[in-house]
Amino acid sequence: MKFFLDTANVAAIKAINELGVVDGVTTNPTIISREGRDFETVIKEICDIVDGPISAEVTGLTADAMVEEARSIAKWHDNVVVKIPMTTEGLKATNILSKEGIKTNVTLIFTVSQGLMAMKAGATYISPFIGRLEDIGTDAYQLISDLREIIDLYDFQAEIIAASIRTTAHVEAVAKLGAHIATIPDPLFAKMTQHPLTTNGLKTFMEDWASFKK
């Protein structure tokens, strides 16, 4: 399984990348806006840090606008993946871009039908949202399981990016269900390394070693 960082904070990306567990980065207009910096500059800086797919999202709403923007974004770096919203216009754009060899990440997927349509259109990645589905009482884990089953059954080349990850339990569950990738907010990476028994165990080891060395 691959781990992507769901942030555009360059300092956080640098720090977490040193752990050796980051395979890529995802961003969206909200995440970019939080940084208050030029979109292109931020994406290029991220590409210089992480050697893996870096998702940058279009903001156009028509297929023509998305394609035009995507072509420009794709030129920023070889690792850039263009994020496209799951709409009819987004599907049109994804189809065009896939034929041009531009990698796409179709986002805001909440149903099996949406995921299937995105894969048929040629998406490189599909991003079903875990937390947001749970917010409305829908079984997000079943969606991941169903999408993975369809990919394996029909040999689609698209990979599942489990998005809207909020807890370590989310990461663990989607890993077991076969999501190819989990995109994780930077604060959650630290939580994934921690457990009280680990902390207490290390404390005991150090205390015992200090007593032994006296």
Curated annotation (Swiss-Prot):
Superkingdom assignment: Bacteria
Subcellular location(s) of the protein: Cytoplasm
Active site: 83
Chief site of localization: cytoplasm
Annotated pathway: Carbohydrate degradation; pentose phosphate pathway; D-glyceraldehyde 3-phosphate and beta-D-fructose 6-phosphate from D-ribose 5-phosphate and D-xylulose 5-phosphate (non-oxidative stage): step 2/3
Catalytic function, reaction form: D-sedoheptulose 7-phosphate + D-glyceraldehyde 3-phosphate = D-erythrose 4-phosphate + beta-D-fructose 6-phosphate
CDD domains reported for this sequence: Transaldolase_FSA
InterPro entries in the record: Aldolase_TIM (IPR013785), TAL/FSA (IPR001585), Transaldolase_3B (IPR022999), Transaldolase_3B/F6P_aldolase (IPR004731), Transaldolase_AS (IPR018225), TSA/FSA_arc/bac (IPR033919)
One Pfam family linked to the record: TAL_FSA
Molecular function terms from GO: aldehyde-lyase activity; transaldolase activity
Gene Ontology CC: cytoplasm
Gene Ontology biological-process annotations: carbohydrate metabolic process; pentose-phosphate shunt
Family to which this protein belongs: Belongs to the transaldolase family. Type 3B subfamily.
Record function comment: Transaldolase is important for the balance of metabolites in the pentose-phosphate pathway.
NCBIfam families (alphabetical): fsa_talC_mipB
PANTHER family: TRANSALDOLASE
The name this protein goes by in its record: Probable transaldolase
Organism from which the protein derives: Streptococcus pyogenes serotype M1
